């Protein structure tokens, strides 16, 4: 299944999702993947009650789809080429807990190009080579994020929703796996 189809599957699969960015590496080679949330739960007991969450590991450029403590799928991602941070207009990937504010594009064709969260009628040509283009299309679907931590990713000058922070498709699939967004 292609990355875009997997991405589409994620969007349609959840009724409650959280996006967590952090710099902790998760070892997916552990024998018991059911215990992957142990470290997260010890710092955030409320995670134990979550049916599903997406966990983003900035260091390894991966996102895990976790359901009831079990890793269902690992996805390679691309965070911001400018690093991590929450300051408005910094173009950086914010850290911390987020929830999905809005899903956009559920009825659009795969690789539809969205500008300003609206399909412009065009379909992106997917670039499999590690080529950074000038256009950086947002494609297929958008999961618009809302920060949940006042002073970290929510509030004046640092608000993830106001900054239009998304999980989204890209035409530059050859760059996935390293900071390139």
What spans do the regions from the language model cover?
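Bacterial N-terminal signal peptides
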Residues: 11-19
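Bacterial N-terminal signal peptides that target proteins for export
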Residues: 2-11
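A detector of low-complexity, intrinsically disordered, Ser/Thr/Gly/Pro/Ala-rich segments
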Residues: 2, 18, 22-23
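N-terminal pre-domains immediately preceding structured catalytic cores
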Residues: 22-181
């Amino acid at each position: 299944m292609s990355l875009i189809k997997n991405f589409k599957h994620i969007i349609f699969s959840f009724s409650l999702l959280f996006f967590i960015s952090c710099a902790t590496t998760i070892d997916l080679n552990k024998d018991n993947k059911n215990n992957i949330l142990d470290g997260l739960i010890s710092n955030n007991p409320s995670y134990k009650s979550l049916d599903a969450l997406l966990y983003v590991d900035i260091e390894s450029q991966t996102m895990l789809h976790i359901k009831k403590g079990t890793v269902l799928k690992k996805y390679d991602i691309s965070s911001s080429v400018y690093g991590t941070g929450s300051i408005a207009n910094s173009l950086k990937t914010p850290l911390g807990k987020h929830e999905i504010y809005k899903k956009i594009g559920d009825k659009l064709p795969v690789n539809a190009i969205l500008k300003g969260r609206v399909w412009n009628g065009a379909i992106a040509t997917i670039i499999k080579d590690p080529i950074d283009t000038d256009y950086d299309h947002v494609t297929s679907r958008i999961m618009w994020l809302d920060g949940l931590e006042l002073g970290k990713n929510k509030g004046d000058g640092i608000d993830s929703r106001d900054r239009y922070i998304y999980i989204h498709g890209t035409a530059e699939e050859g760059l996935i796996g390293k900071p390139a967004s």
